[in-house]
């Protein structure tokens, strides 16, 4: 029996690397997808390509889109500073509609490939308050995929796989260690320098640091 295909969204960060490892353990033939969307931390794209290669993806695509053309996010607008602490509200590092756009591209590629599974590393526990990281969003997009595609109309429903959705960062790291992931090669920082060194103070860095601490695992992140 031929192994099933899957499209896996890979950013170069800790969560998406873990998701790719999970998909590979489940014996999916993985096609990975990354985006240059105008983010200030584009060095993560190099990590995404390397992670995909090292972890056995059969194909890796990088799509260029300009989400920075709209502004509205500290990740794409250089005039907005990346905050060093959460305010309690939806943070300015939220990129409007980002996961909707990413999943739409993944859905298109999955339909072309004949894949029914799309993996994404969203997390609703240790996250920054992004609305497109919630279970309700994943469920709604899965329903949209059934309505908006030929495959869906023909009864070949798509599954949006979000295996990290209800895990803490520490639980994600422990799972990644079990799967043999080298987290030193991942980049999570919102403003990593050109060498991939993390700032250590943005939300993403703080969640990552705390996750390693809570997991009892030495943090392999390179900081500047």
From Swiss-Prot:
Cofactors, names only: Zn(2+)
Keyword Acyltransferase: no
UniProt keyword Zinc present: yes
Pathway(s) served: Purine metabolism; 7-cyano-7-deazaguanine biosynthesis
Cofactor binding description: Binds 1 zinc ion per subunit.
GO MF entries: ATP binding; ligase activity, forming carbon-nitrogen bonds; zinc ion binding
One protein family per Pfam: QueC
InterPro entries: QueC, Rossmann-like_a/b/a_fold
Residues bound to Zn(2+): 189, 199, 202, 205
Superkingdom of source: Bacteria
Enzyme class of the recorded protein, top EC level: ligase
Enzyme Commission identifier(s): 6.3.4.20
Reaction equation(s) it catalyzes: 7-carboxy-7-deazaguanine + NH4(+) + ATP = 7-cyano-7-deazaguanine + ADP + phosphate + H2O + H(+)
Gene Ontology biological process terms from the UniProt entry: queuosine biosynthetic process
Keywords annotated in UniProt: ATP-binding, Ligase, Metal-binding, Nucleotide-binding, Queuosine biosynthesis, Zinc
Gene3D superfamilies given in the database record: HUPs
Residues binding ATP: 10-20
Function per UniProt: Catalyzes the ATP-dependent conversion of 7-carboxy-7-deazaguanine (CDG) to 7-cyano-7-deazaguanine (preQ(0)).
Family that this chain belongs to: Belongs to the QueC family.
PANTHER family on file: 7-CYANO-7-DEAZAGUANINE SYNTHASE
Protein name as it appears in the record: 7-cyano-7-deazaguanine synthase
Organism in which the protein naturally occurs: Nitrosococcus oceani (strain ATCC 19707 / BCRC 17464 / JCM 30415 / NCIMB 11848 / C-107)
């Amino acid at each position: 029996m031929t192994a099933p295909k899957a499209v896996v969204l890979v950013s170069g960060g800790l969560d998406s690397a873990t998701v790719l490892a999970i998909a590979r353990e489940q014996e999916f033939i993985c096609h990975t997808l990354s985006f240059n969307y105008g983010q200030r931390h584009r060095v993560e794209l190099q990590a995404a390509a390397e992670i995909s290669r090292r972890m056995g993806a059969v194909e890796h695509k990088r799509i260029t889109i300009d989400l920075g053309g709209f502004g509205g996010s500290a990740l794409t607008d250089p005039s907005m500073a990346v905050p060093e602490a959460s305010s309690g509200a939806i943070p300015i590092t939220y990129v409007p509609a980002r996961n909707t756009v990413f999943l739409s591209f993944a859905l298109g590629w999955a339909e072309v490939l004949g894949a029914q599974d799309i993996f994404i590393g969203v997390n609703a526990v240790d996250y920054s308050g992004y609305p497109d990281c919630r279970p309700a969003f994943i469920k709604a997009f899965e329903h949209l995929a059934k309505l908006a595609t030929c495959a869906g109309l023909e009864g070949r429903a798509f599954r949006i796989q979000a295996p990290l959705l209800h895990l803490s960062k520490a639980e994600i790291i422990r799972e990644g260690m079990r799967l043999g992931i080298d987290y030193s090669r991942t980049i999570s920082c919102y403003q990593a320098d050109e060498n991939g060194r993390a700032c250590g103070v943005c939300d993403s860095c703080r969640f990552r640091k705390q996750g390693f601490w809570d997991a009892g695992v030495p943090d392999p992140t390179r900081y500047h």
